[in-house]
Amino acid sequence: MLRWLADAGLLCVVKAVKGQAVLATLDDVVFHKGVKLGDIISIYAEIQFVGRTSVEVEMKALRGNELIANAYGSYVKVDRNLRPLKIEEIIEPDDQEIWNVAMRRREERLQKIKDRNERRFDVTNPTIGFRYIITNSLNVTPDLTYNGVTASAGRILKIMDDTGGILCLNYIGYPYSNGHVVTAAVSRTSFYSPVMLGDYILIRGCISYVGRTSMEVTLNVIKYEPQSGITEHVTTTYFTFVHIDENGKPIPVKQYSPETDEEKKEYERAIQRRKKS
């Protein structure tokens, strides 16, 4: 689902700006309903605001008229060297109120990522000191790219989702326990460095919070460029998974108590994040 949302937003932007674009930030994603095998899902993307080089897009997943998931994304028009490119196309708002809300959302986001250049080179491992961890690494092959050059943000998000889900399955003791896990939400995800064909990416994850039926996983992605030897931070975000039974109903997760200093600090930060959501 994450990949569908991200890719739908990209296609919408590429068509509107008549050029290449990349996903810069995916705002809080909320999954309202579960999806079963055989369900027919429609993905919609709508431009809500256009800046000098960036576009704000709302993405929705619907089953009939039922809202399954929604998200907001910020995409940047870029040249062949992935440098921001001015949007020449004039796009007038259909709804001025929606336009203004999207503009404020963009301004708020930009305030929170003023240090994005510093974050780009922060490759600190956030899983050190945690007991429940997972790592996943892969080489970026053509099937993981949009155009044979730039890695698809949607595909990276899908791999992150799968990695976090596996960690949660391990935590609940699958396959020796009842139930499965589903993705319930993804926090704001900003991409600090582009991933290119041939790069290696490393995904590091840890369980940072456990509630009655849910688990929060911190997921950090770094990339390694084999030709230059440079390692950069791609993104760090939080996925929330819910433990469900065979009927899709939430069921309790085994009790969790933070033990290490790192776990205790992150647990408190997770509580604050949940209060703000």
Feature names for model-found ranges:
Residues 1-9, 14:
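N-terminal, Lys/Arg-enriched amphipathic/low-complexity engagement segments
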Residues 36-40, 44, 48-113, 196-197, ...:
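HotDog/MaoC-like acyl-thioester-processing domains
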Residues 22-42, 71, 181-193, 202:
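A cross-kingdom feature marking solvent-exposed beta-strand/loop segments within repeated
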Residues 1, 104-159, 163-173, 276-277:
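Catalytic strand-loop segment that frames the active site of acyl-thioester-processing enzymes
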Residues 14-22, 171-182:
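Short, basic/aromatic beta-hairpin or loop at an interaction surface
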Residues 7-10, 25, 135, 141-152, ...:
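Catalytic cores of nucleotide-enabled group-transfer and carboxylate-activating enzymes in metabolic
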Residues 17-19, 28, 151-155, 177, ...:
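A short beta-loop-beta micro-motif enriched in histidine and acidic residues
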